[in-house]
A protein has these predicted regions:
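C-terminal alpha-helical interaction appendages
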Residues: 1-73
C-alpha cells in the first residue's frame, strides 16, 4: 500500500475512533475494535474504493449506518 494512502487511512481511523469515544462513550480499545472489525474499515482499507480520500465525517456516517443496520447501506 502506498505510504500516502496509509497515512490518510490512519488519520481517518484516528478521527473515527475519537468520534466513537465522544458520541457513543466507548473506551479506546472498544472503539478501535468496533471500527477495525467493520465493513466500513474494510472498504476504507481497499484502495480501489477510493474511500480514503473522503472526509472522516463522511466515513463516520457510513459506519453509523452500518452499525445501525448491520451492513453498509
Amino acid at each position: 500500500m502506498n505510504k500516502r494512502v496509509q497515512y490518510l487511512i490512519e488519520g481517518i481511523t484516528k478521527d473515527i475512533t475519537i468520534y466513537l469515544m465522544d458520541d457513543e462513550g466507548y473506551e479506546l480499545p472498544e472503539a478501535l475494535s468496533i471500527f477495525h472489525n467493520s465493513e466500513t474499515f474494510a472498504k476504507l482499507s481497499d484502495e480501489d474504493t477510493g474511500l480514503y480520500i473522503e472526509s472522516s465525517a463522511y466515513v463516520y456516517e457510513i459506519l453509523k449506518g452500518e452499525l445501525k443496520y448491520g451492513k453498509i447501506q
